[in-house]
Amino acid sequence: ILKQMSQFLDWCVGEGELTANPWEALKVKERPDVHPHGVLKDAQVSVLLRAKDRVLHSAVLFGLLTGMRSGELCGLMAEDITAKGNLGRFISIRPNAVRLLKSKAAEREVPLHGVLEQLLDTTLPTSGRLFPHLTVDKVVKRYAYLRRRHPELHGTVFHSTRKWFITQ
């Protein structure tokens, strides 16, 4: 838009409406270099699993074994889990009362890993939200806490669990 406005002001100068373009000295800064957060290395995954963080451990397992985003995890409901006979159980990721999705393409069904099935059967709630104590903000802050406690996690964020899953 700066370029178009500057061209308009140049036109105004040419038409005699202005004596000089007041925006002539303005320059657009170059876009900053993007430094995306890294993919977890297997050794870092081991650190996360060994930490068995009381707040994030179950969510970390879901992130690593499904590739779900933190917002999707925080809004996960027991009702989102469906059994498909001998195919096992699946998570149906769709908008619900707790969460919106990043895009329409984010709607999907994800097969549940056996470790997660066991977690559902033994630890997580059987109705309502599976992670009622978690919000995206809490996930971000708790992961930052883990990063401080485990310096080898430097350069990673919770979303790195999704990146790790995608590379497996």
Residue map of PLM features:
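Tryptophan-centric aromatic hotspots in well-structured domains and transmembrane helices
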Residues: 1, 57-58, 89-91, 119-121, ...
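N-terminal core-binding DNA-recognition domain of tyrosine site-specific recombinases/integrases
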Residues: 1-10, 15-17, 134-138, 154-160
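Basic, Lys/Arg- and aromatic-enriched nucleic-acid-binding interface segment
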Residues: 1-3, 14, 18-76
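Short, basic/aromatic-rich helical patch in the C-terminal catalytic core of site-specific tyrosine
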Residues: 5, 9, 73, 143, ...
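Conserved tyrosine-mediated DNA breakage-rejoining catalytic core shared by Y-recombinases
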Residues: 25-30, 66, 75-119
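Exposed loop/turn and edge beta-strand positions of beta-sandwich/beta-sheet ligand-binding modules
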Residues: 34, 56, 87, 106, ...
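Active-site/catalytic core of tyrosine-dependent DNA strand-transfer enzymes
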Residues: 96-97, 111-154, 160, 164-165
